[in-house]
Design a protein with these regions (language model features):
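C-terminal motif of bacterial Sec signal peptides marking the signal peptidase cleavage site
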Residues: 13-16
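Short alpha-helix in the alpha/beta-hydrolase fold that links the catalytic acid
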Residues: 86, 210-221
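Primarily recognizes the serine-hydrolase "nucleophile elbow" in alpha/beta-hydrolase
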Residues: 133-194
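Short beta-strand/loop motif that positions the catalytic acidic residue
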Residues: 200-202
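Acidic catalytic loop of the alpha/beta-hydrolase fold
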Residues: 205-209, 238-239
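C-terminal catalytic histidine-bearing segment of alpha/beta-hydrolase fold enzymes
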Residues: 224-279
Length: 279
């Protein structure tokens, strides 16, 4: 029974322009025209060592300056339509966004067992996961619209754990945002190494994030002086930001569900966070 509970807990954590103004200095504020965005979408191929990866990029072509880049690490289901939708939403906000392919060749898991098989090796090898994320960062920096000094990452469930671990391990990111990600990532932050600003968006009703885990997470970051903000959303379970969570929860008997209020609030918190850390 203990093994089953731990497996279910792990499952829920993983579930659920080319004509840019070259005179603009990196780090200078992006000029955004939200009234008339022209979103360009690109399916891209990049590599991490010998692995071929299939990412997805979106940005607003109506912006004529370089802009910050935000990487998106998906839930354990892989590169589904959900992280691509989030990339388009970030593009409308004036960023260039890239949905990251963690599993290789754009693989998607159709059921929890397959997703677990895909995700667990990365959870168990945080440095390899950091390298995977760094490969995506290196690729997005090569895009002509990217302000290479302003790179951040967000992650959902499994992806939330991955970006938190990358921040703890010292990835060169301005900030990371974890949406309903596991807090026990197996990485202990070190003083002077964890520099990225951190925002954690956690569902208050997430049965797999205990008060003890929250306290331990905060204590770890406080002990090394890491900059972080921890937000909780009332009545929000695991996977609260994904509109498909309720259906998947019923289909696979998982305690996950969509919460529109928490989704909206956490997205606004993310926007406010990036307005501060991406300048």
């Amino acid at each position: 029974m203990k093994t089953y509970v731990l497996m279910l807990a792990a499952a829920s954590f993983f579930a659920a322009c080319n004509n840019a103004d070259n005179t603009k200095k990196e780090g200078e504020a992006t000029k955004i025209n939200p009234a008339s965005p022209v979103i360009k979408e690109e399916s891209v191929v990049y590599t991490d060592g010998k692995d071929t990866l299939n990412g997805y990029i979106a940005y607003d072509e109506s912006i004529n300056t370089k802009r910050p880049a935000i990487l998106i690490v998906p839930e354990w289901w892989g590169l589904t339509q959900y992280p691509k939708m989030r990339a388009r939403e970030l593009a409308k906000l004036g960023y260039i966004a890239m949905a990251v392919d963690f599993y290789g060749k754009g693989k998607i898991a159709e059921d929890p067992q397959t997703a677990k098989e895909y995700a667990m090796p990365w959870y168990q090898a945080p440095k390899a996961a950091q390298q995977r994320l760094d490969a995506a960062a290196a690729f997005i920096k090569g895009n002509t619209v990217t302000d290479t000094a302003q790179i951040a990452a967000i992650g959902y469930c499994f992806g939330g754990s991955m970006v938190l671990n990358a921040a703890k391990l010292g990835s060169n990111l301005k900030g990371v945002v974890s949406f309903h990600g596991a807090l026990e990532g197996g990485v202990v932050p070190q003083k002077g190494l964890t520099k990225a600003n951190i925002l954690v968006c956690n569902g208050e009703a997430d049965s797999y994030v205990t008060p003890d885990q929250i306290a331990a997470f905060k204590k770890q970051l406080d002990s090394v002086g890491a900059p972080y903000t921890f937000k909780q959303y009332a009545d929000a379970t695991h996977a609260f930001s994904n509109p498909e969570a309720t259906e998947k929860g019923k289909k696979f008997n998982m305690p996950i569900s969509y919460n529109a209020a928490a989704d909206t609030a956490s997205w606004k918190d993310m926007q406010d966070f990036f307005k501060t850390v991406l300048k």
